[in-house]
Amino acid sequence: MTKKNYNQVSMPYVDLLKSYVKERFIPFHTPGHKIGHGAPKDLRDWMSEALPYDLGVMYALDDLHEPEGAFKEAQELAADLYGAKAAWYSVNGTTALIMTMIMATVGEEESLIIPREVHKSVMSGLVMSGAKPIYLPSRFDEEWGIQLGASLEDLVSTLDAHPEAKAVLLVYPNYYGLGIDIEAMVAECHKRGLIVLVDEAHGPHLPFDDRLPVEALEAGADLVAQSTHKSLGSLTQTSTLLGQGDRIDYRRVTQVHQMLQSTSPNYIFMASLDMARQQMATEGPNLVGKAVDLAYQLRTGIQAIPGLKTMDESQLAKNFDPTKVLIDARDLGIDAVAFERRLRDHKIEVELIQACHVLVTITIGDSEASIQALLTALKEISQECLEEGRYSSPIPSLDQVNLALPEPILIKTPRQAFYVSRETIHLAEACGRICGETISYYPPGIPLISIGEEITPAVIQYMKDKQALGYVPNGAADMSLETIVVLKD
């Protein structure tokens, strides 16, 4: 079969949408604002040029669910750019795509190997599919207070212990830009006949600069979900699913994808994916290369500021993404909340605050000016803390406040647990009951207990120890943890 030659400069869906709007049809269809005429004045003033492109579903503009024309070509162009066999665009974010990957590959009572520290969409996918989770051991760096991802050795031991597993879901890279030995892991899974799914939400920029880690698709993964909007130029909640090889059922992926996407997709969102793909095809190496340069410039600048430090690949990770910059302020004598507050006073908004550090992301949207603004703010904060005498009282090391997580005991699959009635009882009475909520602490950001798991004495003691240290549970209905939600017997 002859390989199709794609014109990566083209934007077929954008061209179709623009052409349709130029026709100036009089709309007797949804949406109700009728190309902006019925929109609130504030909305018209704000989005007057965009509103004519916010159109209802119609055959003239192709169909996200069953594309045959320009949108089909747009997805084919995305697959071609990334070297995939197929691509599926999403207007429901990577959340829907992660659920799609799970539901398309594992079913009721089938086993899926996953990290403990996964996005909540994985749990949703387990509920929808009925699959049984098998957890990889969690690794946590106590100095930096972050998850490291699974090791190859842990994956091998888990595979040995669970030969019944049908698929593996890996997170690569993680929120902090930390990678895993993805190539060796994929090879090990494939050797045993398992399907490899990858949550690559934070990695759509990886193929465009040699200083960045190998992307999951090149490493051999079967299905890869990317948040195109996170590090590239499409609009928020737009994402891309990429598939390759013969281990997956493409018809089933398409069927599940149709189930989980809105039947009223926003055409502006869809067009932004086409634009972002064309931008990377024509300018990707230049744009991403510049972002990587700026990230290294920022790192060098931070290292020269008293009281601040930043993590790099020499300290922790294989396959490290330098555009994720973790800034630690413990030596300034302030925690992450105070650090973030001071940054906001300087009009700097960060991606994440956790424990004693903040995370900033450098993308194709950054510039010399934005980097200099951040460095200026950091220098001024450092000087402020020095003048306040905070340097003399640094924040304690994280290894003084982190506790070893107890091993989870799964009693019911997430799906089984989801459909059981729940009740709230006192924590003191909860030992031996099945948990009806998922509870985590930050750090380490790894679930202490999830829905369907047994509440053991070790779990209760962990809660008490964390509470004594002043930590607040995430995900608990009762933040004081005097009570806890459990499944009814």
Which sequence ranges carry the predicted segments?
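Conserved PLP-enzyme active-site core in the AAT-like
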Residues: Y13-K18, K22-R24, D42-R44, T94-D312
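N-terminal "arm"/small-domain region of PLP-dependent enzymes with the aminotransferase-like
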Residues: M1-G69, P444
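PLP-dependent enzyme catalytic core of the Aspartate aminotransferase-like
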Residues: E351-D489
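Short acidic (Asp/Glu) and glycine-rich catalytic loops that position anionic groups and cofactors
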Residues: Y250-T254, S272-A281, K318-T323, L352-V358, ...
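Conserved N-terminal alpha-helix of the aminotransferase class I/II PLP-enzyme fold
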Residues: L51-T94
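Short amphipathic beta-strand starts and helix->beta connectors
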Residues: P306-E313, L343-I348, C431-I439
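A short linear hydrophobic-aromatic micro-motif
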Residues: A86-W88, Q226, K347-E351, P473-N474
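Conserved PLP-binding catalytic core of the aspartate aminotransferase-like
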Residues: V288-L343, V358-T376, E380, V401-Y419, ...
